[in-house]
């Protein structure tokens, strides 16, 4: 759900944010009723007010990342508020360890400043008042966010800072990502241990238990994804489109699908990509394997290849000399099953995403 723009940055809210709103409102309402002697309605209104303030703090935290990234020329696709707080999407990675470090620490720095301001307000406001209670809880939440996010494990901000440090020392960004990913898994395990300890001591509210466990699971999965991407990164130098791309087998427009498949099966390259060509022999479309698979075998002799082909202009293109980083970035920004490989204005082959996946993750099962 799109909420608008803040400083030109698109702001969205995930549906899971509603769960966060309900859980925090209920937890804080119970606390407010005890501390301030409020009725049920008053407690829930105060709880909702705290949620709004908390989400405002999260937004400022993410704006710290976004505006710092833009300061160094990194485009920002948007900020999303969700169950576990929020995240900022950027259109590319940081160009250097220094920029990576500054962008990663900008969010916790904002939270630390907000926490310090809330601490000062707590000390200045009369105890036992609504304003004092809200200031105290905002101080606690922002300090916790600043400290927890600074832990040195991905996907936390501190993990990105650690990645930048390892990157600076080793000159290998992917090594930094892998190191920070493994430490992120350790942080996830430590979070579970903390949840168990607090539960045994009955120091954790019942509604907070599943939320903290969800945080731990999210950390574990995020760390695992970071480790996976680091391993992929180590294999990117192996990407050579001249060797990886499948050759083209031209078939004239109007050719029955079954006939085109027969020609390919009997040819020298049975894994070739079927390219529909016009009367001049120019490729105009690419047969889509997914569409072919959906056609029953008995219909294929009567169906022209044009019916299961995509116009070449609608298929993402890659120059044959593109390196692994560029190929991966294109795959991220233009997801698809096939990519046209070009040399100048000529189409020289087709990259199948399954072939790229097999090269980058040879132990991972893929569908061809």
Where are these regions (language model features)?
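Membrane interfacial helix motifs at helix-loop boundaries and amphipathic/re-entrant anchors
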Residues: 25-47, 120-140, 196-210
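Select subsegments of transmembrane alpha-helices in polytopic membrane proteins
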Residues: 10-20, 103-112, 177-189
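Membrane interface segments of multi-pass transport proteins and intramembrane proteases
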Residues: 5, 121-135, 165-180
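Tandem CBS (Bateman) regulatory domains
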Residues: 226-249, 260-265, 272, 282-368
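Alpha-helical transmembrane segments and adjacent TM-loop junctions that form the membrane-embedded core
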Residues: 139-228
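Hydrophobic alpha-helical transmembrane segments and immediately flanking/interface helices
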Residues: 119-135, 200-229, 278-285, 289-291
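N-terminal signal-anchor transmembrane helix
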Residues: 1-47, 89, 325, 332-333, ...
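Small-residue-rich helix-interface/hinge motifs
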Residues: 1-23, 43-101, 136-145, 151-165
């Amino acid at each position: 759900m799109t909420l608008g723009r803040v400083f030109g940055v698109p702001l969205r809210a995930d549906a899971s944010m509603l769960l966060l709103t309900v859980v925090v409102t209920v937890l804080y309402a119970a606390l407010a009723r005890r501390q301030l002697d409020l009725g049920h309605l008053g407690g829930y209104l105060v709880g909702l007010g705290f949620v709004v303030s908390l989400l405002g703090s999260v937004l400022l935290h993410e704006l710290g990342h976004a505006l710092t990234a833009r300061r160094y020329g990194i485009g920002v696709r948007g900020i999303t508020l969700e169950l576990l707080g929020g995240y900022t999407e950027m259109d590319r990675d940081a160009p250097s360890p220094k920029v990576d470090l500054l962008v990663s620490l900008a969010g916790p720095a904002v939270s630390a400043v907000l926490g310090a301001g809330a601490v000062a307000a707590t000390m200045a406001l009369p105890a036992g008042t609504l304003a004092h209670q809200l200031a105290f809880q905002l101080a606690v939440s922002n300090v916790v966010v600043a400290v927890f996010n600074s832990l040195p494990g991905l996907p936390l901000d501190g993990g990105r800072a650690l990645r930048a440090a390892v990157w600076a020392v080793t000159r290998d960004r992917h090594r930094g990502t892998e190191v920070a990913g493994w430490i992120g898994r350790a942080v996830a395990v430590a979070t579970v241990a903390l949840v168990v300890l607090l539960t045994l001591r009955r120091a954790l509210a019942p509604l907070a238990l599943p939320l903290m466990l969800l945080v731990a699971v999210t950390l574990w999965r995020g760390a695992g994804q970071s480790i996976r991407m680091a391993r992929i990164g180590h294999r990117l130098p192996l990407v050579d489109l001249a060797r990886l791309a499948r050759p083209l087998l031209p078939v004239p427009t109007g050719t029955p699908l079954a006939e085109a498949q027969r020609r390919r099966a009997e040819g020298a390259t049975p894994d070739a990509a079927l390219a529909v060509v016009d009367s001049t022999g120019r490729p105009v479309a690419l047969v889509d394997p997914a569409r072919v698979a959906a056609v029953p075998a008995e219909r294929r002799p009567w169906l022209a290849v044009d019916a299961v082909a995509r116009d070449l202009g609608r298929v993402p293109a890659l120059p044959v000399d593109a390196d692994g980083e560029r190929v991966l970035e294109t795959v991220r920004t233009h997801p698809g099953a096939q990519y046209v490989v070009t040399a100048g204005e000529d189409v020289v082959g087709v990259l199948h995403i399954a072939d790229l996946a097999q090269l980058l993750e040879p132990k991972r099962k893929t569908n061809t």
